[in-house]
Amino acid sequence: GIKGVFKELGVDYIIDGGQTMNPSTEDFMKAIDSINAKNIFIFPNNSNIIMAANQAKELSDKNIVVIPTKNTPQGFTALVNFDADASVEDNEQALMESLTMVKSGQVTFAVRDTVMNDVDVKEGNIIGIAEGKLMDAGESVDSITTSLVEKLVDEDSAIVTLFYGE
């Protein structure tokens, strides 16, 4: 799954979390303390936990760089752009810049009826969300995924990466 992809890209420690299980500063401190490295880069991959990552950075004696990734695609892109031979400063600059090039979306199930952004949603519908905004709703994962990709991709897009799973 996603954890395996991140491990293959060189991640030393993954803190489990999710939309309803936000890791604490203490969780970050445990991870930091378990890593034997001169420099540690943290990719929160969730806008709700960037503050906890920054608090852990302030509490630690180690050299910590928090790259404020707000979602998994940003974390993936940052990791792909990491250069083990570059300086900490050069990596930080490159990784921060890489975040500006990422557009992300997700396809999931609606948990209730709603109307948002002129999109009528029924509980159980498949919904497409891009950059935190509801874009589409319907019955088919394939059609909603295709619609979402079409809305995200433009003439400046170079790579499309899809992750499938929970």
Regions found by a protein language model. Give the residues of each.
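N-terminal loops that bind phosphate or other acidic moieties
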Residues: 1-166
